[in-house]
């Protein structure tokens, strides 16, 4: 029986800004259908790790693999960059990212926001994309907002539209960077429910979050980052229920207060 490679794999990733080392040898893997949550204090390297995974930023050393395919690099250290632009474009289109700030185009309707990348980047048929975009907006509870402008939506609705936009690219994996942290608690739950639905469908996701309940409820694996290193990782029930690291115990106590 053939074993599928991980959907995403990070090997010994190092990333620094000048003398500040933000990631100091991080490795993890997400199997197809896995939900991996990255938790930790602000400044621990979570968002940087996600951006390096999607090649929005480049690491100084280490490997990024998508479905077993390693990124080709040229140069070393701070001059390192991908050697194959076509490879980067292809992999990025299969790794849709949802940001903390929704980043919807203010001059486009909600429907056009969701359609824009598949039509302009993937050169897909607009009629086919529109049908798909309407379906994804309905999926996230915004079927009646297709013709609305982003300014007419609440924060929770804008983030759900951003998730629909990411899904419309038909990615193999979703990367979500603090998708609920800019929202008040009531609006946050709108987005949490969508993420829970996606997890139940078996979507491969890597989520950076400060929401410990979300991480515990939807994750197959949770990684606690501290000062650019993986301090502890494991199944959510084990990591939250019986943390081994004193630093993790302190963190969980602080976020629960």
Indicate where each model-derived feature is located:
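Conserved ABC transporter NBD signature motif
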Residues: 62-76
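Conserved ABC ATPase signature
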Residues: 149-153, 157
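A short, proline-enriched helix->beta-strand linker immediately N-terminal to the Walker B motif
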Residues: 168-172
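Catalytic Walker B motif of ABC-type/P-loop ATPase nucleotide-binding domains
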Residues: 174-177
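A short, surface-exposed alpha-helical micro-motif characterized by mixed small hydrophobic
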Residues: 215-217
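ABC ATPase "signature
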Residues: 233-234
């Amino acid at each position: 029986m053939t074993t599928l490679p991980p959907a995403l794999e990070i090997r010994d990733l190092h990333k620094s800004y000048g003398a500040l080392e933000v990631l100091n040898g991080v490795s993890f893997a997400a199997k197809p259908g896995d939900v991996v949550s990255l938790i930790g204090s602000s400044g621990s390297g979570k968002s940087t790790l996600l951006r390096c995974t999607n090649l929005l930023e480049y690491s100084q050393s280490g490997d990024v693999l998508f479905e077993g395919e390693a990124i080709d690099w040229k140069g070393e250290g701070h001059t390192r960059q991908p050697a194959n632009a076509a490879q980067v474009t292809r992999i990025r289109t299969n790794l849709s990212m949802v940001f903390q700030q929704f980043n919807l185009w203010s001059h486009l309707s909600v429907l056009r926001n969701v359609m824009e990348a598949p039509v302009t980047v993937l050169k897909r048929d607009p009629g086919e994309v529109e049908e798909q975009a309407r379906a994804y907006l309905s999926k996230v509870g915004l079927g009646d907002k297709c013709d609305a402008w982003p300014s007419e939506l609440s924060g929770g609705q804008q983030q759900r539209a951003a998730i629909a936009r990411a899904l419309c690219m038909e990615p193999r994996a979703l990367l979500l960077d603090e998708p609920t942290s800019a929202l008040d608690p009531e609006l946050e739950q709108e987005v949490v429910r969508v993420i829970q639905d996606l997890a139940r469908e078996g979507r491969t996701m890597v989520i950076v979050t400060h929401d410990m309940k979300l991480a515990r409820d939807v994750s197959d694996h949770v990684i606690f980052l501290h000062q650019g290193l993986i301090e502890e990782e494991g199944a959510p029930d084990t990591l939250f229920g019986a943390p081994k690291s004193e630093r993790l115990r302190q963190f969980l106590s602080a976020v629960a207060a």
